[in-house]
Design a protein with these regions (language model features):
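Short alpha-helical Gxxx[C/S/T] motif in the catalytic ATP-binding
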Residues: 115, 119
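Glycine-rich ATP-binding loops of the HATPase_c
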Residues: 127-133
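Short helix-loop "hinge" at the ATP-lid/N-box region of the Bergerat-fold HATPase_c
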Residues: 51-52
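Glycine-rich G1-box
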Residues: 13, 85-86
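Glycine-rich ATP-lid/hinge loop adjacent to the conserved G-boxes
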Residues: 100-110
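Short conserved segment of the HATPase_c
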Residues: 87-99
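Conserved catalytic submotifs in the C-terminal HATPase_c
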Residues: 16, 21-31, 68
Length: 174
């Protein structure tokens, strides 16, 4: 909740400057999230930046954060929606791939098409999801679902594959 406030506070001035109605709806209760704060912050900022970039003056950007239950598990739900240009249907299935950009480019852009891929990778690392709902000419809604607690990390299994050179420097396990 504190993190969400820190991130959204930084967009209020932009909203005023651009003439965009920016609404923030957040929980009043804490969520227990085991996250990489920098990565999650970056993902949220990326989505908010895109929302502002593609929304015209007098448009709306909405940030909502709540707790939801899915199949008995608690998730933090972060919804970022806008009344911007929307994403063409032919791009929606590939929008989270690297270097994908659309025709609806803002007037000034230095985009390279990796922002949404970074969001997707961040959510994958946190055992979460990112979903898109978009209507061309009406706007887009991105929903992030981040598992609450830390039980989801028990699912991680890693296999370390080494080379003969690595074995020379390996320390024996107790």
């Amino acid at each position: 909740v504190v993190l969400a406030k820190q991130i959204t506070d930084s967009f209020h001035e932009l909203a005023e400057t651009e003439g965009i109605n920016f609404t923030v709806e957040s929980l009043n209760e804490p969520l227990l999230l085991w996250i990489d704060v920098e990565k999650i912050s970056s993902a949220i900022r990326n989505l908010l930046s895109n929302a502002f970039k593609y929304t015209s003056p007098n448009g709306k950007v909405i940030f909502k954060m709540n707790r939801i239950e899915i199949d008995g598990y608690s998730f933090c739900s972060i919804i970022i929606s806008d009344t911007g240009k929307g994403i063409p249907e032919e791009l929606r299935g590939r929008i989270f791939e690297s270097f994908i950009t659309g025709e609806n480019t803002p007037l000034f852009s230095n985009k390279v098409g990796i922002g949404l891929r970074i969001v997707k990778n961040t959510m994958d690392l946190h055992h979460g999801t990112v979903n898109l709902d978009s209507t061309l000419g009406k706007g887009s809604t991105f929903t992030l679902l981040i598992p609450e607690g830390n039980a989801h990390f028990a699912e991680d299994r890693y296999e370390i594959v080494g080379t003969p050179e690595m074995e020379e420097y390996a320390l024996p396990l107790p």
